[in-house]
Amino acid sequence: MKERTIQPVNNGLNGNITIPGDKSISHRAVMFGAIAEGKTTIKGFLPGADCLSTISCFKEMGVDIVQNGDEVTVVGKGLEGLQEPKAVLDVGNSGTTIRLMSGILANTPFFSCVQGDASIAKRPMKRVTNPLKQMGANIDGREEGTFTPLTIRGGDLKAIEYTSPVASAQVKSAILLAGLRAEGVTAVTEPHISRDHTERMLEAFGVKVTREGKTVKLAGGQKLTATDVQVPGDVSSAAFFLVAGAIIPNSKLVLQNVGMNPTRTGIIDVLEKMDATFTVEPINEGASEPAANITIETSSLKGIEIGGDIIPRLIDEIPVIALAATQAEGITVIKDAHELKVKETNRIDTVVAELTKLGARIEATDDGMIIYGKSALKGNTVNSYGDHRIGMMLAIAGCLAEGKTTIEDAEAVGVSYPTFFEELQRLTK
């Protein structure tokens, strides 16, 4: 377990950053390229551990994939061309890989076994395996398909109309991907609209997807046609530097090519509500995934209440929003965020525990947290618990804290932002 020591930043963070490729879009580009007909070229791919797990799984199923830094070429096999893997498909730490790939495996007639690391072994799979079983896939796992390893034998699926108890893009995507080869029209209805990268990218690959309110539908029997994909920067990775720019004194940062998909920009809405000083300049009007350059500078933030429909649009940003709230005047309440409990760690507990070690006044609630600003943070030894987003949030906190902060298990950030610490160092000069 590697540790990193963060020293306080005295002269602010200043400069330009090109944010690495969006993790959600990178995963999907590889998967959809693999089941499309023809050659897909992906530019701006995120070469983090999670997305590399997706590549290795599809290579194991006979797909020809060449990755060179942030450029990837996938020679698609079509929906019916995947081969039975000879080895166990290992997703590493990636919840996106296991859940979306389960939807694809559910419509293949061969046998496969899927597993991941210790964190994946604790994450609930039944929310995906149950609807896939209803469609006719044979899936088993520990505790009746609740936990990995999962065994899947697919094929001969029937479409379903599924009402999901949670707003989860992974659940929705798995069902839609299974529906590509199911008989009939597959429909998924959610309590709130979750991120829609799957729908946007399926359309880019030539699949007709219908959206009506909180319901998404597609008819079985459609083929994917290869297309080139330009991946914008990941707004979830940008969030750490957006908050850093707002809370670290004497800072001004320009974040380039940040993905601005409206189902993902809750962090932008929250910073606006907290009175952060920033500008957004759109750069690729009309693209299937919009992007912008964002300039942010040191701001006087105020506490707010965050809950309801916005939560699925910022669920991954809550750790760093909590940090921002420690530097805001007044109280910030985050609620309706039960999903935090089933992320890489229980992010309610880990955020509260680690920020408390740094001197923040913050308490856990059943569905979120209450943060009392403004707190003077003091350096300490903290732990990421192997969770990339906790690790990056603590690094930004360390820049602000008095004295040095040591982060244990700091290499976890490589899952989504392999160059994070180098970028942070460059901006402090």
Swiss-Prot record:
Pathway: Metabolic intermediate biosynthesis; chorismate biosynthesis; chorismate from D-erythrose 4-phosphate and phosphoenolpyruvate: step 6/7. It is found in: Cytoplasm. Phosphoenolpyruvate binds at residues 23, 95, 123, 170, 347, 389. One of its GO terms (molecular function) is 3-phosphoshikimate 1-carboxyvinyltransferase activity. Its EC number is 2.5.1.19. GO terms for biological process: amino acid biosynthetic process; aromatic amino acid family biosynthetic process; chorismate biosynthetic process. InterPro entries: Enolpyruvate_Tfrase_dom, Enolpyruvate_Tfrase_sf, EPSP_synthase, EPSP_synthase_CS, RNA3'P_cycl/enolpyr_Trfase_a/b. Its main location: cytoplasm. Coiled coil: none annotated. Keywords: Amino-acid biosynthesis, Aromatic amino acid biosynthesis, Cytoplasm, Transferase. Gene3D superfamilies: Enolpyruvate transferase domain (3.65.10.10). Belongs to the EPSP synthase family. HAMAP family: EPSP_synth. Catalyzes the transfer of the enolpyruvyl moiety of phosphoenolpyruvate (PEP) to the 5-hydroxyl of shikimate-3-phosphate (S3P) to produce enolpyruvyl shikimate-3-phosphate and inorganic phosphate. Monomer. This is 3-phosphoshikimate 1-carboxyvinyltransferase. It comes from Bacillus cereus (strain AH187).
